[in-house]
Amino acid sequence: MPHSYPALSAEQKKELSDIALRIVAPGKGILAADESVGSMAKRLSQIGVENTEENRRLYRQVLFSADDRVKKCIGGVIFFHETLYQKDDNGVPFVRTIQDKGIVVGIKVDKGVVPLAGTDGETTTQGLDGLSERCAQYKKDGADFAKWRCVLKISERTPSALAILENANVLARYASICQQNGIVPIVEPEILPDGDHDLKRCQYVTEKVLAAVYKALSDHHVYLEGTLLKPNMVTPGHACPIKYTPEEIAMATVTALRRTVPPAVPGVTFLSGGQSEEEASFNLNAINRCPLPRPWALTFSYGRALQASALNAWRGQRDNAGAATEEFIKRAEVNGLAAQGKYEGSGEDGGAAAQSLYIANHAY
């Protein structure tokens, strides 16, 4: 076997590794604010707000205007293309607002899922064309990490070997291209919670998917110390009749990661996958209390599970912006504690935080 050509210099590797470690510093996670225009339409329609560019800007401003309390619990924010070039009411670019808090700016770079021909409704993710040029531009515009989401689903016949292999290779190509441009890739192979499968089945599929992803990353010479993983937690299907404890979910999740994710990876930033805000926090907390050795930071990269209460409090009204921002800060602080296994629960049984955020066949 010939030697691989050294694609990255020592300086490039150090930059990537430093960025990744900043994002997942102890007690810090990621705010995923990269919902597409279509996804924002769904969010805003829930509160009776029209999906205009200005309303999307105002809503993102609610999140980004959080004060310095978020410095200790948010290490990175994932932007959508439109948001990367928007400004707050005072004309300050959102990118600068986030960077001034010492938080790393990221960007969603995939172009969405498309059908994978010859499969039972499975998908791959598009967006590799022109990705290198886009990454170079995003780097100039202030982004230091990126996100790419692939989607797999569990049923009697899926995920197929073809879908697993194809999505693993797409993620590896994306990761390699990002690193060439000084951008840390977040690798997101999401296994959807749709279905009635139990915890064991999800664990088995998660292990097979992650094993394929890390084989592909190795084949593509991706520098693991300069990457992050954004997986699903191992949970039962949404229609599964069995209820599992956070401790059972934590044990299954950490076991799957220990069997597949190399210790060179600095951090695992879980997606919330339609869990309620409280559920996502309790499960993350249990994962960080799991008695198994865990060589990586285990933290959050939450969208809905950081935003649902804030969105509910805002309802499109300027007068509600301050209260909505407080709701976001509260969730960020809670998850910062959960990322250290220090969350004891809020004592709130009801309210928006306990509402399921599940959406069937969730597309971003």
UniProtKB/Swiss-Prot annotation:
Recorded superkingdom: Eukaryota
Keywords: Acetylation, Glycolysis, Lyase, Phosphoprotein, Schiff base
Record protein name field: Fructose-bisphosphate aldolase C
Protein family membership: Belongs to the class I fructose-bisphosphate aldolase family.
GO MF term list: cytoskeletal protein binding; fructose-bisphosphate aldolase activity
A Pfam family that the UniProt record links to this protein: Glycolytic
EC identifiers of the protein: 4.1.2.13
